Amino acid sequence: MLGLLRRLFDNNEREIARYYKQVVEPVNRLEAEVEKLPDLAAAYRELKEKHEKGASLDELLPMAFALTRESAKRYLGMRHFDVQLIGGAVLHEGKIAEMKTGEGKTLVATLAVALNALTGKGVHVVTVNDYLARRDAEWMGPVYRGLGLSVGVIQHASTPAERRKAYLADVTYVTNSELGFDYLRDNMAISPDQLVLRHDHPLHYAIIDEVDSILIDEARTPLIISGPAEKATDLYYKMAEIAKKLERGLPAEPGVRKEPTGDYTVEEKNRSVHLTLQGIAKAEKLLGIEGLFSPENMELAHMLIQAIRAKELYHRDRDYIVQDGQVIIVDEFTGRLMPGRRYGEGLHQAIEAKEGVRIERENQTLATITYQNFFRLYEKRAGMTGTAKTEEKEFQEIYGMDVVVVPTNRPVVRKDFPDVVYRTEKGKFYAVVEEIAEKYERGQPVLVGTISIEKSERLSQMLKEPRLYLPRLEMRLELFKKASQKQQGPEWERLRKLLERPAQLKDEDLAPFEGLIPPKGNLRTAWEGLKRAVHTLAVLRQGIPHQVLNAKHHAREAEIVAQAGRSKTVTIATNMAGRGTDIKLGGNPEYLAAALLEKEGFDRYEWKVELFIKKMVAGKEEEARALAQELGIREELLERIREIREECKQDEERVRALGGLFIIGTERHESRRIDNQLRGRAGRQGDPGGSRFYVSFDDDLMRLFASDRVIAMLDRMGFDDSEPIEHPMVTRSIERAQKRVEDRNFAIRKQLLQFDDVLSRQREVIYAQRRLILLGKDEEVKEAAIGMVEETVASLAENFLNPEVHPEDWDLEGLKATLLDTAPQLQDFPFAELRALKAEEAVERLVEAALKAYEAREAELSPPLMRAVERFVILNVVDNAWKEHLHNLDVLRQGIFLRGYGQKDPFQEYKIEATRLFNEMVAFIKSEVAKFLFRLKVEAEPVRPVREAPYVPVPEAKPEPSEVFGVERKRATPPPQPGLSRAERRRLMRQEKKRKK
């Protein structure tokens, strides 16, 4: 194991050494030359011309990086460090750069962005929320504009026109969800002017900020565009009432109980519930039905299961909050609210019924994709985060991305203390309060991380109400009494009398008795515990001002986080992932100055305002004063910013002397990575700092995944909440529990991807062919329509004209009725004459007749109108069929695991069934399009000529089948044979296709 770790670190060191030689040294050599350039944009244009003439991006990297560094120096007052140049190179190579908090990931991205923008295909910088997208675009905008590049930013409220313009920019800042939904909406567009992504190379290169959050934490979350589906909502209320009447029991357990007890059992690890026989009978009685799981009642059974899951597994203020009569999901990884996102399969409706709010109608999926498959569509992708190495295996296996740990500019000096473990959650929270009180009294800033809104508010309540701490004092007092019961004498009697009123004890009351207590042993331990409890209560009574940052109180988020490093500051926050504001010791003077100027009417994101603030904070007052005159900033504002700078500087020195920012984790997360993100908020850029996690065996991680043997051992040893548990077995148990959960979650994500890959291949085919219809030339659209007509007529005819059956026995009446249902224009076709032909010839005769009827239809409508009709019909039929196909795949997936009981591999079964459903859908599309094109009545005003849509080359879809809508790619078409009619050539192609099948 040590050898493996050593090899991993050696590999990383070798990579870093390579970057120093190939990137850092050449860029540094160019610095003096680039500093003298009067026009950086002109120099950048020269690089672009070189690239167009064949120079590779790797060859142009040193100069592109040097120009970007100089642009940042000129327009932001920031110079890329050498390690930041390495980070830029890592991103350019399509890898993940692990960079610690405060190392300037936002600035690093500009290097890879500027280099890859030379292609002219557009670069997407993907962030986790609108605030960061806007902030980073406006903050880094001057760097790009200094090179002559345009910058776009997309927000949730952006209009289609604004989105189109932003995506056409050289650099686009956008959130992962907006980008994914724009992709899905583009693939539902019915005219080219509805598209917002670029027509050519829509997904060229993406740099994903907080890449672990998006590609791992969010991997199981599908992006879904949906429309309303009809389903009665009052049933959900009824199911919520029935769920209340059913009682939770215990599962069957070997050697303990043969059968499960109660009406249902709960499996928290998998978030599933199982009705017992007793529960099924009770539910049937309450519903007034028989056979809850019979086919006709399956919908009721599903709704009841979801109602029980809502009752037992989804908790208010942890998994969701209720706000303005709506159930809003809380992101379990970031603690942020996710308005607009809903649980699927009726679970959200079940929660709404449980909470008694109005139930929104269930939706039907119109388009869907997971982040895993969406980001794999990019020609090149890269990522940045503070924590990725622990998940490197997953990044490599699923995304083909290596992780490179970029060295910090200054060494990390933060101290990470061992975990403190308590038997119960109550004991753990008392200990956390004691630690907060101690740090607050010293003046050291504290950031407390919790995993839910409920826990953050509980801790806040304990700090506000000293009476909630009294049980801890009483417990400490009992322990001291027990330890001192054999002690005798007048002094001891005085002490015992004093201790009769514990709530009124003060530090000075206990001081005179210090000499009674021996320096070591149980009595000393109990005495120190009592003194600490008395002192903590006194600090709580004086008050511990604190800020709570969670999904309920997020409006002042950036301000709270920016000032969390000031002395005597206590901040309680749910998970800190994705909170993009640096915590600077002594407070963030830049943020305070920006807030001050904003109040005075200045745009804090305007690049000259930002540059002015940076110059003032850095003490470069002459340069700042010149900018102030240009911007119209008054002298008194300069003085106030100077005061802010000095206050923060003095406070920074005070906080450094106290040990920097201290991080307290109130619970270990399922993933070590999330714990590391919290730790990483302290010790930025070589600052001092510390961290410690408090854990209890009541925490979800330990309760669900820790070893039963360890818990049984603790029970036998009689551990209570008076002191933390310190044992190597406990520490190992925590590590093993986290590893177990990480492995399990990776397996789930891998399985999700396996199943989603089946859908992904089908989606790529449908979307690529759909895009061809939307953006292709008129002749390609006509070719597709004619192909569908031919395929449909031939397929219908072959069902009746069997070559192995004598022509006299062919059911020509049935054939006629079937074909006329599709193409009424064949009414006058001489069906009886077919008996004189061979089956193949008869089929071709019918196809030829259908094509003539189609040409007549086109002449009747006019070619431009016919093309418009073809586009409209094909796109609408495809969209409706795809929507139904997605529903069918959902139903298939929900029940596929039952096939495991029949000794069949569920995935293989899913693959086979999904392929069958896809082929049926394709056949249905062709049939419906043919029927619509023959039967559609066009009633319109005199038609104006329809302009041909601009032709844009569409990349080939990778997966099979390569042809769906009847458009034969030129490379797949057999060479024309002299003397053959078009129909004969088509027949040969159909025979070739059949042979391949």
From Swiss-Prot:
| Basic and acidic residues bias: start-end ranges | 957-971
User: Could you tell me which InterPro entries the record lists for this protein?
Assistant: Helicase_ATP-bd (IPR014001), P-loop_NTPase (IPR027417), SecA (IPR000185), SecA_CS (IPR020937), SecA_DEAD (IPR011115), SecA_motor_DEAD (IPR014018), SecA_preprotein_X-link_dom (IPR011130), SecA_SF2_C (IPR044722)
Instruction: Write down the Gene3D superfamilies for this protein, in alphabetical order.
Output: Helical scaffold and wing domains of SecA (1.10.3060.10), P-loop containing nucleotide triphosphate hydrolases (3.40.50.300), SecA, preprotein cross-linking domain (3.90.1440.10)
The domain of life for this entry's organism is Bacteria
Composition-biased stretches, type Basic residues, lie in 984-997
User: Any idea which UniProt keywords this protein has?
Assistant: ATP-binding, Cell inner membrane, Cell membrane, Cytoplasm, Membrane, Nucleotide-binding, Protein transport, Translocase, Translocation, Transport
Instruction: Identify its membrane topology class.
Output: Peripheral membrane protein
Quote the CDD domains the UniProt record gives. Answer: DEXDc_SecA, SF2_C_secA
So what EC number does this one have? 7.4.2.8
One of the GO BP terms on file: protein import
Q: Which Pfam families match?
A: P-loop_SecA, SecA_DEAD, SecA_PP_bind, SecA_SW
Q: Where does ATP bind?
A: 84, 102-106, 582
* UniProt-annotated location(s): Cell inner membrane; Cytoplasm
- Single Gene Ontology MF annotation: protein-exporting ATPase activity
Which family is this protein grouped under?
Belongs to the SecA family.
- NCBIfam families per the record? secA (TIGR00963)
Q: What is the annotated role of this protein in its UniProt record?
A: Part of the Sec protein translocase complex. Interacts with the SecYEG preprotein conducting channel. Has a central role in coupling the hydrolysis of ATP to the transfer of proteins into and across the cell membrane, serving as an ATP-driven molecular motor driving the stepwise translocation of polypeptide chains across the membrane.
Q: What is this protein called?
A: Protein translocase subunit SecA
Q: What species is given as this protein's source?
A: Thermus thermophilus (strain ATCC BAA-163 / DSM 7039 / HB27)
Lineage in the entry?
A: Bacteria, Thermotogati, Deinococcota, Deinococci, Thermales
